[in-house]
From Swiss-Prot:
Catalytic activities: an N-acyl-L-alpha-aminoacyl-tRNA + H2O = an N-acyl-L-amino acid + a tRNA + H(+)
Protein's UniProt keywords contain Lipid metabolism: no
EC number of the protein: 3.1.1.29
Entry keyword set: Cytoplasm, Hydrolase, RNA-binding, tRNA-binding
Gene Ontology molecular functions: peptidyl-tRNA hydrolase activity; tRNA binding
Organism placement in taxonomy: Bacteria, Pseudomonadati, Pseudomonadota, Gammaproteobacteria, Pasteurellales
Compartments, record wording: Cytoplasm
Protein name (record): Peptidyl-tRNA hydrolase
Entry GO terms, CC: cytoplasm
Subunit organization: Monomer.
Amino acid sequence: MSEIKLIVGLGNPGDKYTDTRHNAGEWLIERLARRFNVSLNPESKFFGKTARTLVNGKEVRLLVPTTFMNLSGKAVGALASFYRIKPEEILVIHDELDLPPGTAKLKQGGGHGGHNGLKDIVAQLGNNNNFYRLRIGIGHPGHRDLVAGYVLNKPSPADRDALEKVLDEATDCVEMIFRDGMVKATNRLNSFKI
């Protein structure tokens, strides 16, 4: 199994989007940066904010694209190409409509499920979808016509509380990947309930 060398948190740039559901991936990267005691700094050649850290003696890069969500692949592709990071060495963290708030799932590969950030990353990695995903449940508004407005709005206080709890657990589980391996971290995160 490949080691994770790049962890990407998806979101939209700008204060207006900071607290919206679509930025759940970025929220987790910010927690990881605090956990690993590093700062995310703008790096224009990677179209995002990046940090480099050592986790259990292994070099890992954190990335938050500063492009809009549907262009996330531009940042991921640029950094992965520059550092010769393979798709299977990448973990992408993103919001997931098909999971309820307070849940998260880790998996490798799969489709994009209509998520425009994932769609662009797959395209920019040469149509390779073999990267890992950490999907943070944000719930579904009930009808597909409501999705765009839903993901670009703030979660309710109850949902935000559930998200905070699962983000704490996910932070521990990402760190666990480097200590105990992907299988143990996946089993722990995928069975988490609040």
